[in-house]
Amino acid sequence: MSKIKIIPLGGVREEGKNLYVVEVNESIFVLDCGLVFPEEELLGIDAVIPDFTYLVEKKDQIVGIFLTHGHDDAMGALPYLLEKVDAPVCGTELTIELATISAKSQGLHQHIENFFKIDEDVEIEFEDATVSFFRTTHTIPGSLGIVVSTDEGSIVYTGDFKFDPSSSEQYSTNYGRLTDIGEAGVLALLSDSADAENAIQSVSDKKITADMTEVFRNEDGRVIVASIGSNISRIQQLFYAAKNSGRTIF
C-alpha cells in the first residue's frame, strides 16, 4: 500500500499560481509551477509565486516537474523553482519552447538540457507511480491533463480546461482517453473550477469565429480587435475571420 500525500502550494481558492505536489512514498511529482499577477493593492510587486520551502527541503525526492500548458499561471514560476531545485521538466512542444524562453531570460541555460517534450501518448514509469497524459481544450495549443497512477488508484490533474465539441483538432479534448481513465479507477480528481459557479454556458469557438467573420464583412471601415496576448486560440480565430472576409491584418 502506497503512502500518498496531495499538497496544494498554490492555485486553490485563487486564479493562478497553480502548483500541486503529489507525493507517493518517497517520490515527489510537481504538477505545474505558475505565478499570479498581483491585485492593485500590491503596488511595486510584479508577480506572486508559490512558497517553495517544502520542495526545497525535499528536493532530492522530486522525480519530475510536469506542466499542463504554456500560460504564466501554469509555468510562470518555473525559473524561480529551478534556481532552488534541479529536476526534469516535461511538457508538450509549445509548452517546453515557452519554458525554455522563460528559463533563458533568467540565465538558467544549464537547466534546458533537462527539459523534455512529451505528448498525450507518452507514459513515464517511476518506482512509485506512472505518469501519463490526456489532451484538453484550452486557449493555447498543447494543453494536457496529467494522470499519476498509483497502486491505490489514479490522481487526475486537469489543468485549465473547458469542454467545447466545436474546437479544432489541435485544441480538442480526448474524450475517449477520459473514459479510459475513469474506468480504470480514480482516487482523486484535482480539477480546474474557474467559473464553476456560473450557470451560463460559454460560447463555442465555432460561434465566436462566425461572429467575428460577420463583423469583418459588414463593417466598412477599420476594425480594431483587443485580445489577451496569451489567448492563442482567439488570435488564430482573428486570422481565420480576416481571411474569410478578405481583410488585411496590420
Where do the model's predicted regions map?
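His/Asp/Glu-rich metal-coordinating catalytic cores
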Residues: 1-66, 71-250
